[in-house]
Amino acid sequence: MVHHSGSIQSFKQQKGMNISKSEITTEASLKPSRRSLPCLAQSYAHSKSLSQSASLFQSTESESQAPTSVTFLSADKPEHVTSEESRKDSTLKCSFADLSDFCLALGKDKDYLDESEHANYDRSRLLNDFVTKDKPASKTKLSKNDMSYIASSGLLFKDGKKRIDYILVYRKTNIQYDKRNTFEKNLRAEGLMLEKEPAIANPDIMFIKIHIPWDTLCKYAERLNIRVPFRKKCYYTDQKNKSKSRVQNYFKRIKKWMSQNPMVLDKSAFPELEESDCYTGPFSRARIHHFIINNKDTFFSNATRSRIVYHMLERTKYENGISKVGIRKLITNGSYIAAFPPHEGAYKSSLPIKTHGPQNNRHLLYERWARWGMWYKHQPLDLIRMYFGEKIGLYFAWLGWYTGMLIPAAVVGLCVFFYGLVTMNESQVSQEICKATEVFMCPLCDKNCSLQRLNDSCIYAKVTYLFDNGGTVFFAIFMAIWATVFLEFWKRRRSILTYTWDLIEWEEEEETLRPQFEAKYYRMEVINPITGKPEPHQPSSDKVTRLLVSVSGIFFMISLVITAVFAVVVYRLVVMEQFASFKWNFVKQHWQFATSGAAVCINFIIIMLLNLAYEKIAYLLTNLEYPRTESEWENSFALKMFLFQFVNLNSSIFYIAFFLGRFVGHPGKYNKLFERWRLEECHPSGCLIDLCLQMGVIMFLKQIWNNFMELGYPLIQNWWSRHKIKRGIQDASIPQWENDWNLQPMNIHGLMDEYLEMVLQFGFTTIFVAAFPLAPLLALLNNIIEIRLDAYKFVTQWRRPLPARATDIGIWLGILEGIGILAVITNAFVIAITSDYIPRFVYEYKYGPCANHVKQNENCLKGYVNNSLSFFDLSELGMGKSGYCRYRDYRGPPWSSKPYEFTLQYWHILAARLAFIIVFEHLVFGIKSFIAYLIPDIPKGLRERIRREKYLVQEMMYEAELEHLQQQRRKSGQPIHHEWP
């Protein structure tokens, strides 16, 4: 409701509010328009915060214009104050908060740099003297958290007031003094306040504490279009929503009878975030009085303040020259050794959180999220977002969603595995292999290999059946549908989060050019069609040339990976005969398993070694392209890293799945590599066991290695840093910024490694799931640990990363969708080619006892093993033996008219395989497309709410502008109009 009578001053006097000096001055005139900036309105509904925010900003401006007003702090009345102002000022009710805000003008025009600059006066004594002399009738008490925050020694400047927003670190012995000096002078010229302080543990280390004052904060918040709250949200319900609410209330009553879900967090333990329940709009200094500013020190969150400071650091020059700009270049050339925002305090407390509450948000995150004892609890996403920023918040939201969706996939995969385990002894194929004591298999190598009884493969046949049974096709279809459902519902979840976190249309508002791009192409400018302003432009010819060079580098690295896989294949061929003649009987009997196991370990070592080179090459190629924005740089770098890692990780698996044992020839005419090494054959029970072994070992070892590098390595480094400090000083005397410096920095590429690890795992879980149904279960167990491991790492082991914003998970969503498509194709080929599902199917309905419905009471796969093995005359091998040996293939026997040629059954199986691939792909793709069509990316209710709020925001803008003009007319004595001018 809008009030059209009285003024702000009279309204505040009626409510008993304080009136600041700045409210007595005449407000700057505005020229409102219906086409002015949206969302910049505030009515009498928040008149208290309105007048307070106006006074905060205007007092800063007035004090900067008249420095002599600082003498108002003395007991005597200043001479330049008029009698009318003196009369009004004498009625003010002074409070500690008002005085603290006013005292910010002290030293505003002063450059804060030297260590001793803030030691010239005792601020607390000054405040106490003033409060004692004036003896205000009432005081605004600070909250417990505010008092602990002000008293903390590691979060403020030496004056005990100015908050530390960013930390720069350098060494005194570094020779880049001129660059640092120029850079720091330019920072002060931009409005930042700096304060130096040496490290306690190492005097050679110097810290520069950076504080961004209110006026500079407002200027850059307006420039960056930072959205801030300006009015509480008002919700509406139509008849349809009312009916829904009745149903929801009914279910709520039922839930009350049931026990509380142990996975749900206790909401009373978390602070309410005011901005999540307010309409927001881009900040504007001209209309600062419209916003809800209860406290200007907390109006912009810590994350926003740090983000604005980093924006300034990245665009400040340190030398003459267009490219000599940015803190990252200064860190690269050694001028500074680190730059980071500080943590909000210690993450542990001697006082229990249940009785004394959290000391700070970091402490709260540790107790309610990062501790291992909270592994079964939901994540406090709003608090994560508030502390680490939206980008990291979205990562943990996606990781939690992915982990939750793995539960049904793991359950179904486990059921398929248990089905194979229960029916393993009933398998007709396994029974025939285990009973084939008189069937001899042809030697699998030319030297040191002898004839082998078929029943020696009994164990391998049973293990193969665990992963290759009747549920394999069903599980492959299920996982393809699961991948689609997971991605579609994540899009809905993401849209809800972007709305809740006020990220709708954020990218168009805040995306800026990279300094490197601006420095490279500053001479070639074009008019931006959106902003209408000139900006640097990269010519198309230059862009295409750089992309061609980058693509060439990518193909070179992929060819290097393929070469490494080929080397492992050669190794398998060389050591195959060596293991067959090994001295140890166990290795000699299981030489194929030993060959595969050793090859897997060597392949894993090669994967880890190549990973070290991939990151540097991808970084070099991405910088060579000169991406326009940070998001483009991240997407390009992430795509290269994914391609390198995906090929590196899966190339050996693709070889085993689709090439191992496919082109070996037949006894007497084997194909050889370089006319020397005979190609490797599959085990008598099939190649699927080799594929399972390869996937299981790589997945298990890689997850252990990643977890160690993510947590174990930082733990060791941080322990060593603390150990060196404890030699000469106590931990209690170390300030927060030095404790943060002793932590490990976050990876320079941000969340890329975290996403890459999970996306590669998603590929393992979906692409070859037909061969390894336990992959979702292993992924689920790993992710339960991964969430708390990452949380513990972010909260306790890493310096606080820059709180960046993002609307989605970036290019990773497109990569996940591509993996989902590739998974359908790959599983179709795995079922059709790698497994024996199609040969069994053809035998069952064409060549077996049940063909043409002749014998319906017998097992339809009876005789399948004998049918799938071909004959070869041993006399042709020159081994001095007679008789026949068997081998896996569909070729004619030696006594046929066309010996060792493919039989008709081979061509039937080949046709069935191709037909299955086509039918499977079309069926699954059709189901995936239908499901994607049924599930909209944005829920209908959310879409309606967004449209409703846009309408309300525009109406509020008109209403508040009218109200502000009426206030102006009341002050000037002009007539009031109750309609829009």
UniProtKB/Swiss-Prot annotation:
The keyword Transmembrane helix applies. It comes from the Eukaryota. Residues 1-28 have a biased composition (Polar residues). Residues 76-87 have a biased composition (Basic and acidic residues). Residues 425-469, 572-592, 662-761, 832-914 are extracellular. Predominantly expressed in neuronal tissues. Expressed in brain. The chain crosses the membrane at residues 404-424, 470-490, 551-571, 593-613, 641-661, 762-782, 811-831, 915-935. One of its GO terms (molecular function) is protein dimerization activity. Glycans are attached at residues 425, 448, 455, 866. InterPro entries: Anoct_dimer, Anoctamin, Anoctamin_TM. It is found in: Cell membrane. Residues 1-403, 491-550, 614-640, 783-810, 936-981 are cytoplasmic. It catalyses: a 1,2-diacyl-sn-glycero-3-phosphocholine(in) = a 1,2-diacyl-sn-glycero-3-phosphocholine(out); a beta-D-galactosyl-(1<->1')-N-acylsphing-4-enine(out) = a beta-D-galactosyl-(1<->1')-N-acylsphing-4-enine(in). Keywords: Cell membrane, Glycoprotein, Lipid transport, Membrane, Transmembrane, Transmembrane helix, Transport. GO terms for biological process: calcium activated galactosylceramide scrambling; calcium activated phosphatidylcholine scrambling; detection of mechanical stimulus; detection of temperature stimulus; establishment of localization in cell. It is a multi-pass membrane protein. GO terms for cellular component: plasma membrane. Has calcium-dependent phospholipid scramblase activity; scrambles phosphatidylcholine and galactosylceramide. Does not exhibit calcium-activated chloride channel (CaCC) activity. Seems to act as potassium channel regulator and may inhibit pain signaling; can facilitate KCNT1/Slack channel activity by promoting its full single-channel conductance at very low sodium concentrations and by increasing its sodium sensitivity. Belongs to the anoctamin family. The term 'anoctamin' was coined because these channels are anion selective and have eight (OCT) transmembrane segments. There is some dissatisfaction in the field with the Ano nomenclature because it is not certain that all the members of this family are anion channels or have the 8-transmembrane topology. This is Anoctamin-3. The gene is Ano3.
